């Protein structure tokens, strides 16, 4: 069992149950999955760009990413239906907690000019989304072997019913939220 999962079960969940005034420990919000998404727009012109994105995503997440294809052709972006334009990874259970620990303790502190995560990044249903401008904040990525700096979207899906519950959950996991 991951250290973070054990901390959640032993410390965070009872504290949140008390703080949120919930009757049952099963009502306490928890993180169900973390999704990483990387759009690779230049993959339409350069096939090697997708390979670099896939290797970076594999190193960061520890599992093979799913290649996402264009749903329809868009002449303005010079893409055709079915062409690869990005990749995504959905992490659950053990890998999710390991990634969360690396994100909070290593990656977020390495972001340049970081002043805290935007508290408006919640979607109204207890899920949190954030974007990274460069993948080199993760220690698994070797800066010398990176062909291009790519950003990615990170979505944390929780069982929280409101943004306030999700905010309390992420603060308990030491997320540096502003305000």
UniProtKB/Swiss-Prot annotation:
Keywords: Ribonucleoprotein, Ribosomal protein, RNA-binding, rRNA-binding, tRNA-binding
InterPro entries according to UniProt: Ribosomal_uL5, Ribosomal_uL5_bac-type, Ribosomal_uL5_C, Ribosomal_uL5_CS, Ribosomal_uL5_dom_sf, Ribosomal_uL5_N
GO cellular component labels: ribonucleoprotein complex; ribosome
PROSITE patterns xref list: RIBOSOMAL_L5 (PS00358)
Disulfide bonds listed in the record: none
GO biological process: translation
Entry keyword Transcription regulation: no
SUPFAM superfamilies: RL5-like
Gene Ontology MF terms in the entry: rRNA binding; structural constituent of ribosome; tRNA binding
Membership in a protein family: Belongs to the universal ribosomal protein uL5 family.
Assembly behavior: Part of the 50S ribosomal subunit; part of the 5S rRNA/L5/L18/L25 subcomplex. Contacts the 5S rRNA and the P site tRNA. Forms a bridge to the 30S subunit in the 70S ribosome.
Job description of the protein: This is one of the proteins that bind and probably mediate the attachment of the 5S RNA into the large ribosomal subunit, where it forms part of the central protuberance. In the 70S ribosome it contacts protein S13 of the 30S subunit (bridge B1b), connecting the 2 subunits; this bridge is implicated in subunit movement. Contacts the P site tRNA; the 5S rRNA and some of its associated proteins might help stabilize positioning of ribosome-bound tRNAs.
Protein name: Large ribosomal subunit protein uL5
Lineage: Bacteria, Pseudomonadati, Pseudomonadota, Gammaproteobacteria, Oceanospirillales
Gene designation per UniProt: rplE
